[in-house]
Amino acid sequence: MKPGAERRLLQAALALCCLSPLGFGLKGMIAGPAMVGGGESGADLISHYRYLSGLFFGLGLVLASCVPRIEARTRRLRWAAGAVVLGGLARLGGLAMGDAPSLAHHIALAAELGLTPLLVLWQARIARPPAA
């Protein structure tokens, strides 16, 4: 694959991945924990959920800011990806403690701990100048 085409493919993949934190972050800021169903929530839980949703949305903005000049955004992408992986490790820890989230959360876990590191490795390949 030509370098320009591979770069555009990585940009498209990252842009697609940004839809999750942007979409779910925004939905969580608006709906609070009601977005995942369940019973009544106290004001503190609602506030905390909205705050974390705002952080999630912000992380999506940081990732989206890497798309236009993906080859030059190594440090920014790695920091953001590190936050995603850390969140995935927290989710995995909950799973190990007996939490039984929905299938959607299992898919998110796979993306956080599988897809995210692969995107970082792919970006490192794109950021490296081709050998002469």
Model-derived regions, located:
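Alpha-helical transmembrane segments of multipass membrane proteins
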Residues: L26, L63-A64, R91-G93, P117
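Membrane-interfacial loop-to-transmembrane alpha-helix junctions, especially the N-terminal start
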Residues: A72-A83
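Cytosolic juxtamembrane helix and N-cap/initiation of the first transmembrane helix
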Residues: M1-S20
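Core segments of alpha-helical transmembrane spans in multipass integral membrane proteins
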Residues: L19, G23-K27, L45-V67, G82-L86
